[in-house]
Amino acid sequence: KYALQSSKKSFTLNGYVLDSISKETLIGANIYDQKNGVGTTTNPFGYFSITLPEGGIKLNFSYIGYAVKQVSLHLWKDTMLTIQLHNDNQLNEVIILSDKPETGIQSSRMGASSIPIPHIKNTPALMSEADVLKSIQLLPGVQNGMNGTSGLYVRGGGPDQNLYLLDGVPLYNVDHTLGLLSVFTPEAVKKVDLYKSSFPARFGGRLSSIVDVRTNDGNMQHYHGSLTIGLLTSHLQFEGPIWKDHTSFIISARRSYIDCFLPLVMPKDERGGYSLYDINAKLNHRFSEQDRLFISFYKGKDHVYYKYKDEDKFKQTHDWGNILLNTRWNHVFTPQLFSNTTLAYNRYVFDIRQEETSSIQQPDGSTIINGSHNLFHSGINDLSVSTDFDYHPLPAHKIGRAHV
């Protein structure tokens, strides 16, 4: 007698993990199948894909700060799910167990850290201004330069050796007020990842570190606004649905007001000041479960000026800042194949202007007026198109490809 045993068929379970209230996608949410002992995480767009054997499965969906959700089902075909997790602020019994010593060595994300947004907002900071980069400075292997500045020295590297990404697009200058603040407004940020080593191939090469910042998509259910007043800056944010469950927007603005008070303590013939502002805006539209569109905008600027006026006139201004416009299209070709196409424009400008006028009285009573105007300009303009593909053939394997 001969016994023939056929292997079980495998099917793919894919979908998105969302916040139950705002319908924001959750980046890095965990999906674990208790029966087969395999799992995966959501990508930067909240999408997951996992291939499992045919039959009954019991999935745990979890994310920090949210209640664990269990889903049991019989998998007999490729299935797409949208999972909504609920906030859980209750602290149950906590059992602290130490990891095995080799856990960090065997991890595929060795050298990577995720910084929770509540941790950033609650970290004590200079002038009570919460800052993303200053929170990163508290991590092991990261140091700051001058006290109070936001520069990152990661494992001996310099600040110019770091790659800063905002929604996947590089920023060439991330400092405000000579490094006292960064351009990342905490209220507009959704996820922050720091890579100190073992950089994922999708980022290309970098000498020191990669700081990957993702911004909020906007609430698809309810309108919500907030106003924050600080010692250096004030922040205003408003978000809500344009078409409930399909289209949302978010607008976030921050500005300093040093320039409003500094002239009050200066001599009458002198004026000077400093100001900064950041504007973040995003439009998010879901065409279907397979197609989503994101349009992001960022503009930030620092402005320093000084002028005096008596018999002579002098004026000098320094301006620098970033402008970023980013359009991203997500498409699910198959349950195992996910793509993201990005069209991005990025501009960085640094300008110094000087204007000077002087008058010389001649013996014959005539006046000679000399004037000069100087402009020192430098900048970078980037226009890029890229497509990334993620293929998940097996739970423990992921294949990616990018076209730039």
Question: Predicted segments — roles?
Answer:
Residues 399-404:
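Conserved small/polar residues in nucleotide/adenosyl-binding loops
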Residues 290-339, 347-381:
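Flexible loop and strand-edge segments within Gram-negative outer membrane beta-barrel domains
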Residues 1-4, 38-41, 65-67, 97-200, ...:
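Periplasmic N-terminal accessory/gating domains of Gram-negative outer-membrane beta-barrel systems
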Residues 1-93:
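Periplasm-facing N-terminal accessory domains of Gram-negative outer-membrane beta-barrel systems
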Residues 230-255, 268-303, 320-339, 345, ...:
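Transmembrane beta-barrel wall of Gram-negative outer-membrane proteins
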Residues 179-182, 190-200, 209-240, 248-255, ...:
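Short strand-turn segments of transmembrane beta-barrel domains in outer membranes
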Residues 13, 150, 207-209, 223-225, ...:
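Hydrophobic, lipid-facing positions within transmembrane beta-strands of outer-membrane proteins
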